[in-house]
Amino acid sequence: MGYYDIDDILADGTRFPCRFNYDVPGLGYLEGNPGRPISKNAKLELPLWMVHLLAVVGAQSNEDSRVEEPLPFVELLPPDLFAPRVLNAIKSGATSLDLHSISPHFYTLAEKWATLFSDKELSQVLKDMLLERGQEINNHAISVSMFSNCNQTNDSAVFLQTLDEFEKTIYRDTNVNCKEMKKWLVLK
């Protein structure tokens, strides 16, 4: 992940649900009401890069001056991406899950979410899923480079459509490294 990584940029553009904790003047255009304020408790979906900043930065409220730590501008709401049904599906069989249909940047978003909220359960689920799916990715990448059977290639094409962008990178790297290893063994 880096500043110029296109997958990271696309992941940061993913919209997440949030609720405003304050009336904010002049931001009504986010709701489709230009020139009007966003009212307190208004629910919107905003890009992750914006929500992250608004969820971390707080504002001084005139309502309760005794509060030591200012309340952030927005409260992030749990997205469907990390709903209990999705996490249960991952736990029950990560290899059979079509991760790309859930989100093309699932791992990147999950990593950012787990970091933002220090979500240990999500981190553990991600770790277990990556280990389980990583073995399957490795098996497919090696079998494609070892065998050029048409039926094998069709199975791998279907499998590749279920991978998110991070997993596709792992697949490509594994496939290239396996081919390079075969070349090296032939030369030796």
Curated annotation (Swiss-Prot):
It holds the Pfam family PSF3_N. It is found in: Nucleus. GO terms for cellular component: GINS complex. Keywords: DNA replication, Nucleus. The keyword Nucleus applies. GO terms for biological process: mitotic DNA replication initiation. Component of the GINS complex which is a heterotetramer of SLD5, PSF1, PSF2 and PSF3. Belongs to the GINS3/PSF3 family. The GINS complex plays an essential role in the initiation of DNA replication. This is DNA replication complex GINS protein PSF3. The lineage of its organism: Eukaryota, Fungi, Dikarya, Ascomycota, Saccharomycotina. The gene is PSF3.
